C-alpha cells in the first residue's frame, strides 16, 4: 500500500471512529435526559403495551389525581407528602420539598416530575396543578381519557378548601 492510500485510509478510519463516538455520546445524553410519562398504575405494573416499568433512580413524569385525605405536611419545613391515584387502582406516594402551586388541592389532577426514589415513591422536583376545568397537558389528557372518569367536585373543593 502506498503512503498516500495509507494516509487516506487512516483519515477515513479516524473520521468513522470520531463520528461514531459523537453519535454514541449524543444518544447517551438524550437517553439520560429523557422524561417518560407514567400513570400510577404504569409505575406499579408497567406500561400496557411494552410492560416497561420505571427503575429506581429514573427521572419520570407522573400524572394522576391527588388522593383525598392523603396530604401530610411537615409543620417545620416545606416538606409535603401525598398520594396520587388513577381509576385503574394504582396509587403512588409523592414527596415534595418546595411550595406547592396555588391551585394544588386534594382531588385535583396534577403532574409531578422527579426521580423514583423507591418502588412506588416519587421524589418530585416539580409539581404542576391543573389550572382550570378545561386545560390539561396532552399526555395527561390521553392517559386520563383511558383511565379516568370526570370527577364531581363539592363546593369546598371548588372554593379551594382542602
Swiss-Prot record:
Cytoplasmic side: 1-8
One record GO biological process: cytochrome complex assembly
Primary location recorded for the protein, binned into one broad class: membrane
Transmembrane segments: 9-29
GO molecular function, one term: heme binding
Recorded coiled-coil stretches: none
Matching InterPro entries: CcmE (IPR004329), CcmE-like_sf (IPR036127), NA-bd_OB-fold (IPR012340)
Residue ranges that the UniProt entry lists as topological domain Periplasmic: 30-162
Keywords of this entry: Cell inner membrane, Cell membrane, Cytochrome c-type biogenesis, Heme, Iron, Membrane, Metal-binding, Signal-anchor, Transmembrane, Transmembrane helix
GO CC term (a single one): plasma membrane
Binding site for heme: 131, 135
Membrane topology recorded in Swiss-Prot or TrEMBL: Single-pass type II membrane protein
Subcellular locations according to the entry: Cell inner membrane
Pfam families linked: CcmE
Family: Belongs to the CcmE/CycJ family.
Name of the featured protein: Cytochrome c-type biogenesis protein CcmE
Gene (UniProt): ccmE
Amino acid at each position: 500500500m502506498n503512503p498516500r492510500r495509507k494516509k487516506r485510509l487512516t483519515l477515513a478510519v479516524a473520521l468513522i471512529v470520531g463520528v461514531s463516538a459523537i453519535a454514541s455520546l449524543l444518544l447517551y445524553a438524550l437517553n439520560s435526559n429523557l422524561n417518560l410519562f407514567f400513570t400510577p398504575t404504569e409505575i406499579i405494573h408497567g406500561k400496557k403495551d411494552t410492560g416497561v416499568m420505571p427503575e429506581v433512580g429514573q427521572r419520570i413524569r407522573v400524572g394522576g389525581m391527588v388522593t383525598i385525605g392523603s396530604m401530610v405536611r411537615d409543620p417545620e419545613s416545606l416538606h409535603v407528602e401525598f398520594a396520587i391515584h388513577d381509576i385503574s387502582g394504582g396509587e403512588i406516594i409523592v414527596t415534595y420539598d418546595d411550595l406547592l402551586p396555588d391551585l394544588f388541592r386534594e382531588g385535583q389532577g396534577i403532574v409531578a416530575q422527579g426521580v423514583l426514589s423507591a418502588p412506588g415513591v416519587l421524589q418530585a422536583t416539580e409539581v404542576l396543578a391543573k389550572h382550570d376545568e378545561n386545560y390539561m397537558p396532552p399526555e395527561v389528557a390521553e392517559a386520563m381519557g383511558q383511565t379516568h372518569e370526570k370527577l364531581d367536585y363539592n363546593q369546598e373543593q371548588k372554593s379551594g378548601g382542602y
